[in-house]
């Protein structure tokens, strides 16, 4: 493990599995310290976090398209943040990235599931958690590929369609 700046921060973790709607007793906050990065890792200061309906499903111990969040693990979600230190060949300090990290002030990442925000970005960064992120891509491909809508077709979207349906 290489020497890096020491960072103390807060993270939200899954304390217990919810039964019904999630409550504040299911999630707790703890202090975490990072004092080194391995080769291939980067440290991200998270600036935006998603709060998507899928997170509640990940809190359950049910198989899904994503594995359940383990007890005592950080709550997984999409984030947007700035790389503050990197030992990864594809990312440099100052890069703005979005991807799957967690509800924490900082994330240590191996770069998997991370995408750089273009340097010439002119859009608010939170767009990368909605229209430009997984939610937006799901909505786009749902309409263009799965639904195969054509000119003149009518689309009715339920208010219960969630984040994807809102796009």
State where each predicted segment sits.
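Short, Lys/Arg-enriched N-terminal segments with co-localized hydrophobic residues
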Residues: 1-4
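Short structural boundary motif marking the start of a folded domain
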Residues: 7-12
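Short polar catalytic/cofactor-binding loops
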Residues: 15-20, 49-51
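Short glycine/threonine/proline-enriched tight-turn/helix- or strand-capping micro-motif at secondary-structure
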Residues: 21-33
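Glycine-rich beta-strand-centered segment in the early N-terminal region that forms part
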Residues: 33-51, 59-103
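NAD(P)H dinucleotide-binding glycine-rich loop of Rossmann-like/cofactor-binding domains
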Residues: 77-82, 93-159
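N-terminal Rossmann-fold NAD(P) dinucleotide-binding loop
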Residues: 165-166
């Amino acid at each position: 493990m290489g020497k890096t700046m020491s960072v103390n921060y807060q993270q939200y973790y899954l304390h217990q599995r919810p039964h019904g709607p999630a409550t504040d007793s299911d999630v707790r906050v703890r202090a975490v310290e990072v004092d080194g990065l391995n080769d291939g890792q980067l440290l991200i200061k998270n600036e935006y976090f998603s709060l998507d309906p899928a997170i509640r499903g990940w809190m359950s111990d049910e198989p899904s398209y994503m594995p359940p969040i383990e007890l005592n693990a950080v709550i997984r979600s999409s984030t947007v943040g700035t790389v503050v230190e990197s030992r990864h060949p594809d990312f440099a300090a100052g890069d703005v990235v979005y991807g799957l990290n967690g509800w924490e002030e900082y994330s240590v990442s191996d770069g998997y599931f991370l995408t750089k925000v273009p340097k010439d970005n002119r859009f608010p960064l939170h767009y990368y958690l909605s229209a430009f992120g997984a939610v937006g891509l799901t909505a786009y491909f749902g309409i263009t590929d799965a639904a195969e809508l054509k000119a003149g077709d009518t689309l009715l979207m339920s208010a219960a369609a969630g984040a994807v349906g809102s796009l």
